[in-house]
């Protein structure tokens, strides 16, 4: 059984609690809880999603409203509270599965289980670009497919799935994932997450999230109007077959508490 309302899409959680460390802070969240920036000088501001999933296949999008200096990260976090992250330590790094950017020309693709903060080692791979695309910047839409049952992730930019060395990604056909990980090691709930750094004297990065509620990203671009295979969502680009919008209608619910199945 699945929950009835399709209107409850994942947003960014303004009520998320700061961690105990100064490098575990919730950023500023605006525009219907979909737009985020750090708001904390010389720190990453983190924004986690309201919906977590342990299993399934999910499609999400991020829009780079402002490509700030020096870095940002989008993806998923294994855990239910923001963790310590400053870009130079290994604490909690293994709990991220993400695409990130650090000033220069590199995309970083990081799977669950990575503990490296140095590009090119321990599965943290730097790419001057995907071999078929450039580094994403202001005005670009980042696409992501996650298969939490198989431990695979795909990333793309502006409607084109990235090639990180083995051919262009093809999530619909389970081909050429950009990232893989051991499912059993990260079996608990995962939440979408966005990180932005704010640095004095530089442009601050701003990113807008779309779990299927608004393909215009709060009016920043023209609508896409693409739904998932169940008919839910409004995405800029079409979700690959089998990958769903992160909304209540696509989340399983036990018959024991489903109003449609109980007598109460």
Please annotate each region the language model reported.
Residues 1-264:
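PRY/SPRY (B30.2) beta-sandwich protein-interaction domains
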């Amino acid at each position: 059984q699945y929950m009835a309302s399709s209107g409850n899409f994942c947003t960014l959680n303004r009520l998320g609690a700061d961690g105990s460390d100064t490098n575990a802070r919730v950023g500023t969240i605006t525009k219907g809880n979909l737009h985020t920036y750090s708001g904390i000088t010389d720190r990453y501001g983190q924004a986690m999603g309201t919906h977590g999933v342990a299993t399934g296949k999910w499609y999400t999008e991020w829009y780079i409203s402002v490509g700030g200096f020096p870095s940002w990260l989008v993806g998923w976090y294994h855990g239910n509270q923001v963790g310590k992250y400053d870009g130079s330590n290994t604490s909690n790094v293994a709990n991220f599965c993400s695409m990130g950017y650090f000033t220069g020309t590199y995309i970083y693709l990081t799977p669950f289980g990575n503990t490296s903060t140095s590009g090119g080692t321990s599965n943290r791979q730097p790419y001057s670009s995907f071999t078929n695309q450039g580094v994403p910047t202001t005005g670009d839409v980042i696409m992501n497919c996650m298969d939490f049952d198989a431990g695979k992730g795909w990333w793309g930019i502006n409607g084109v799935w990235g090639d990180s060395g083995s051919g262009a990604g093809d999530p619909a056909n389970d081909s050429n994932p950009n990232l893989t990980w051991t499912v059993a090691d990260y079996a608990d709930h995962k939440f979408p997450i966005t990180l932005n750094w704010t640095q004095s004297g530089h442009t601050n990065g701003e990113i807008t999230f779309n779990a299927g509620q608004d393909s215009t990203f709060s009016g920043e671009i023209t609508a896409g109007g693409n739904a998932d295979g169940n008919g839910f969502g409004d995405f800029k680009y079409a979700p690959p077959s089998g990958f769903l919008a992160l909304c209540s209608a696509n989340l399983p619910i036990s018959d024991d508490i489903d109003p449609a199945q109980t007598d109460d």
